[in-house]
């Protein structure tokens, strides 16, 4: 699983956790956010997951059931590409989400348990030249999220804006992180 090696009792802000989740797929931060929000809703971690499922239904999702907060394989957890596009389009309406999802990088500051800063980098190759590879940068890409599990393979949500139009693209079950390198974008 992906993580940023945070320690029990370490103090991070919600914003710092969201950057860690979106840029580094930090599962420990995803769980911390879910537990915190679930408690704010008067419950616990499961309360957060139940709220995710309720919100998905409100958005019109018909082929989605969340059973965890990080998307790791679970036989009672699934989402279709169409439903992920609905969820992503709704998330994109939020200014904070757009800022985080479109950030090439972010540095977590020192904390009460970690005496060094932690650099986070967006793994979305249209946003950040990950590992020095700038061949996939796309100037109209405004954000996105990569993902990978052995069950789901490579997944990608991308946002792009051009000529006043915002596009949401969802790719699931890709064999490699760069499956479509033979295509060019205008």
Tell where the protein language model's regions lie, with residue ranges.
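Active-site-adjacent loops and short helices of periplasmic peptidoglycan-processing enzymes
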Residues: 1-82, 91-95
């Amino acid at each position: 699983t992906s993580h940023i090696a945070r320690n029990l009792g370490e103090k991070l802000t919600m914003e710092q956790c969201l950057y860690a989740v979106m840029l580094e797929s930090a599962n420990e931060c995803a769980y911390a956010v879910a537990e915190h929000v679930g408690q704010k809703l008067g419950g616990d971690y499961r309360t957060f997951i139940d709220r995710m499922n309720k919100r998905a239904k409100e958005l019109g999702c018909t082929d989605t059931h969340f059973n965890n907060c990080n998307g790791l394989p679970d036989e009672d957890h699934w989402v279709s590409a169409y439903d992920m596009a609905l969820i992503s389009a709704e998330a994109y309406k939020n200014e904070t989400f757009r800022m985080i999802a479109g950030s090439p990088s972010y540095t977590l500051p020192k904390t009460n348990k970690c005496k060094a800063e932690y650099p986070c980098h967006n793994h979305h190759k249209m946003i950040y030249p990950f590992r020095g590879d700038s061949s996939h940068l796309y100037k109209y890409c405004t954000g996105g999220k990569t993902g990978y599990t052995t069950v789901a393979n490579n997944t990608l949500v991308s946002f792009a804006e051009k000529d006043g139009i915002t596009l949401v693209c969802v790719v699931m079950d890709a064999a490699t992180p760069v499956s479509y390198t033979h295509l060019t974008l205008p």
